[in-house]
Amino acid sequence: MPADMKSGASDPRPSGERDKALNLVLGQIERNFGKGSIMRLGDASRMRVETISTGALTLDLALGGGYPKGRVVEIYGPESSGKTTLTLHAIAEVQKRGGVAAFVDAEHALDPVYAASLGVDVENLLVSQPDTGEMALEIVDQLVRSAAVDLVVVDSVAALTPRAEIEGEMGDLAVGAQARLMSQAMRKITGNIGKSGCTVIFLNQLRLKIGVTYGNPETTTGGNALKFYASVRLDIRRIQTLKKGTEEFGIRAKVKVAKNKVAPPFRIAEFDILFGRGISTLGCLLDLAEETGVVVRKGAWYSYEGDNIGQGRDNTISWMEENPDATATIETLVRQKLTEGSEVKANSMRPLAAAAKTAAADKSAPAKASEAAA
């Protein structure tokens, strides 16, 4: 490139004049559009993304701290996979810290007894059961703009039925009506969400695309707008049913972070959901204690500081319930190791490799135990 072109690429004005011009235009923009309409990224304390705990330590790790404040989150998965349970735990965490939460129950299926058993203060939880999708999203918009609500949950996108479809006859086609509704709503409320610091969680259902031969036929309802506007998308699946004998008492859930704009994506977290009790916090702690080496598992036995504390996972969790002081010490040690940079499956940058390593270790453990017995 010629030398004169290189020199022409830079501003010939002295740096003092450029700074003065920049300050003038910044002042003009703030006068026209309000304070905070433009800022230097390094000067903006609001640009630091704070988080809300999910209620599961493994999922908090996978998300980089929890659900981001002032962002849109989408949680999707098959039926009975734990979507609503996740949001109820988030509501409980917000209320514990003195925050205000709202639940927009478009499915008209909220169980207040179950919510209370998970720690939700149902007396102070704001609940709306809207008649139409437009009504639901308008309520969300007004709650967000009030800047007085910390968390809004919408259950679910699939149940946000457009007014035209409700007022029409059964069997009438309303092609793309829900997708247009969601697209308009996202354009309208996303800016307000960022300004207010309110987190909005949309639950979504899965559908199957017709005629897909190759690739994943699954898709979510409501069009593509939510996929783009969401800062975090979580794919939750039920991978195991927990049993005591023939009695089922819970499920093992796996969450994949399908999208994350505030932390590395594609991490995987697993945790237990107990029927009537929600996420097993002690189960999450035991998983992380084993992965960080605070608790050691040999065969079916778990040991802590050289002493056996339980045979089998369920007995070990029972021991942790009966010994809260030791459990608190274990949690402190686990958090210390995680702070120091210990890599576990939930915060691994190679989640698939970590999952394969864990699976291989699980398979080899019984073989080693049988060799030792022989």
From Swiss-Prot:
NCBIfam families: tigrfam_recA. It is found in: Cytoplasm. ATP binds at G77, P78, E79, S80, S81, G82, K83, T84. GO terms for biological process: DNA recombination; DNA repair; SOS response. The gene is recA. Belongs to the RecA family. Transmembrane segments: none annotated. It comes from Synechococcus sp. (strain CC9605). This is Protein RecA. GO terms for molecular function: ATP binding; ATP hydrolysis activity; ATP-dependent DNA damage sensor activity; damaged DNA binding; single-stranded DNA binding. Pfam families: RecA (PF00154), RecA_C (PF21096). Disulfide bonds: none annotated. Keywords: ATP-binding, Cytoplasm, DNA damage, DNA recombination, DNA repair, DNA-binding, Nucleotide-binding, SOS response. It comes from the Bacteria. GO terms for cellular component: cytosol.
